[in-house]
């Protein structure tokens, strides 16, 4: 399908009376302190090596020379000046990174596990469902009223199953791949076997089911225009009516949740090398420090993955890393070493694999602290030590995470943080408060066990 040009998109995309202007996309670049933000939504997180080279060139010419890997498996370019927006858009469209329809860009938020289709433990290949869903979303005009933040999650019992994202609509496979549990404005609770699901459906009708759900939601949106996400609807009395409407609208059976505890999801095999579902094939997982790449690192990454015997796409993970699939056994060591040389963490206990942060000050309007600088301090401090996953957020919005990390440091001022530990019993979205107004040095000492209270 021919991708629209920048000028065509300017004519076709209609303004809407909501806050979508604040949500980055390919054609909409809201302004931060450092310039416009362009979000490139990748189909199921996949990116070809030739596209990697093109993105590296684009950020060098039209942005700040950096590429952010997002926790939805997308890319983000920052520092885009107004006079460069059209040039950047047309460059990205020429790389095949645009949507099927202009308005469809906002609905490309479909996440699958980064090893979907290649995972040795998968119960079902969710890339087939995800690809069909992406096409339906981008070509069904009635759904264009939904929020650009409206997100979908499809898990297939992979070792890299996405367990830490709240989605508007989620599907999670049972052990044999025949059924999907489903839920809204939540995440699959694997600790209870997905007992929090609203019900289950036959996997063969997954896209039909989501279409039925969205049709019912759009009807409610017509009555209540502020309802453009499932989290809005769940707060209203109409939510129970919505659940009944789905049963009336969906032509196939909706059954009770299927309680299951997939063993594979406990592994979270995102960093290192692992066997694939395909015989004698392996995938490699790695993460750049703080989930960011320079243009030069992106070029070198493209060169490394292009040396494989195949040209299959790299996958961007929900932990701001990459998966290099379809490696032969004799390629593994070279690829791991080459990635490590250009700044990737290639071992799961590497500090750079476990420190996460947003853009922060001075780049973001809301940022109270330079979390990238402080995040790098933690990486350097724990260079030869083990650190649990920690999220440094420059404000309480916590854009990087929808659920608490093991530890969360919330900025209170430049270089100072309140430190939280994940705790399901806590009412705080970050967990249990451990200490207040710690300097980043004190945060490091606390995590290292050198201090217990300030």
What are these regions (language model features)?
Residues 65-69, 143-147, 218-267, 310-318, ...:
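Flexible, glycine/charged-enriched surface loops at secondary-structure junctions
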